[in-house]
Amino acid sequence: MDLVTRRIRGALGIAGPLLFLEGVPRARLGEVVRIRGEPEANGRAAEERSGQVIALSRDRIAVQVLEETRGLAPARAEVTLTGQVARLGVSRGMLGRVLDGLGRPADGLPPPVPEARPAIHGAALNVTRREKPSDFIETGVSAIDGMNTLVRGQKLPVFSCAGLPASRLAAQIVCQARVRGGEAFAVVFAAMGSPFREYHAFLEAFRAAGVLARTVVFLNRAEDPPIERLMTPRCALTCAEHLAFVHGLHVLVVLTDVTSYCEALREVALAREEVPGRRGYPGYMYTDLATIFERAGRVRGRPGSLTQLPVLTMPDDDLTHPIPDLTGYITEGQIVLSRDLDRRGVYPPIDVLPSLSRLMGLGAGPGKTRDDHRPVADQLYAFYARGRDVRRMAAIVGAASLGEEEKRLLAFADAFEDELVGQGGTFRTIEDTLEAGWRLLSGFPPAALTRIPERLLRARSARPAAGAAAVSGGAVA
């Protein structure tokens, strides 16, 4: 036993997943602990459990046990404090693997051979070394690519409501996402608090689409301890940082569901007997979420990038709830799913009006996607917003009372939702999306297209067949 390792026999007691000790010298918050019970009746050594120090007082500590505490006798427990914080062995060999929430193999294969073992809490990127996010990540989803473009190095959350197909959308993005130009690309997917049916659906979707080879999957199940849920996104990001900044890959990290993470954060905070903040969540939840989201970005002089797409469920459909509220302050926009669109059978039910990508200008337009990307998106936004206003007015006065222009806008809003947003499970390139936008705009006279420069309208008029191009795409399982 080295100088930093301390071994203690006997604990004060156990309460649920918590183990309480006293008289522990030099204990540190977040320190990794190993726990072993008394030998079994047949003489076989007891199974070793692991844990983490989550609370310190003057003479006592609380340890969150990562496995079950059933059958563990406090008086006979042997506890070893390792003096180490949680670390993860990372390597490029993690691609194609399915791991549990702590990075241990969950696919029956041996652990990947590590190239390094960094601490999972990571280190903040030096602000003077941060590169501005730029370039386009194609998700294959028109409402994102065309209207709220995702940029390499960005953190763009998806705000969902209970019962909406956020998990299906997350799986679809994992299956479809790519970078243009043939650069190396990978996806790190982390599910937090997923029930059995959901995480098996994720795996089946990834295997059916043939994308598992370029994906690292971290699965934290609903029955796993809350402290593991707090470590899962950090393990995923530690892996992603290694792939991005050591191997030069462009990495998209999809985290779902951040609400499950925050519930676990609240549960652990209550176990520590901390003073609760808004709605029972700890007052430091903003800082804690920032330690996750701020790990996205690009580093000057390094070829890779780390982009985040966290998915969260808004409790009670409340956009002002602490979880989406604080997330919105840290991230760079939001993709909002609509219960009304879902009720009408539109998938994905993305409401583009409250949705926003603040960095869209860095990844869309000349040299990034297409010259007409921003003008077409702006014009679609303008007509759709007016069409939504007309729809509300028609609900009061009746559609028969509308003028010709209002009827045209109302028809546009319906077609926009059904044809552009409601693409189903198909993959669309950015060219497919923009051609679909032009096709919708073709129902208006050129004089009404005030957001599109004259030179683009003239160039478009020289391509009469392009405006009638059909929306294409391949089905994604």
From Swiss-Prot:
NCBIfam families: PRK04196.1. It comes from the Bacteria. CDD domains: ATP-synt_V_A-type_beta_C (cd18112), ATP-synt_V_A-type_beta_N (cd18118), V_A-ATPase_B (cd01135). It comes from Anaeromyxobacter dehalogenans (strain 2CP-1 / ATCC BAA-258). Belongs to the ATPase alpha/beta chains family. InterPro entries: ATP-synt_VA_C (IPR055190), ATPase_a/bsu_AS (IPR020003), ATPase_F1/V1/A1_a/bsu_N (IPR004100), ATPase_F1/V1/A1_a/bsu_nucl-bd (IPR000194), P-loop_NTPase (IPR027417), V-ATPase_su_B/beta (IPR022879). Gene3D superfamilies: 3.40.50.12240. The keyword Ion transport applies. One of its GO terms (biological process) is proton motive force-driven plasma membrane ATP synthesis. The gene is atpB. This is V-type ATP synthase beta chain. GO terms for molecular function: ATP binding; proton-transporting ATP synthase activity, rotational mechanism. Produces ATP from ADP in the presence of a proton gradient across the membrane. The V-type beta chain is a regulatory subunit. Keywords: ATP synthesis, Hydrogen ion transport, Ion transport, Transport.
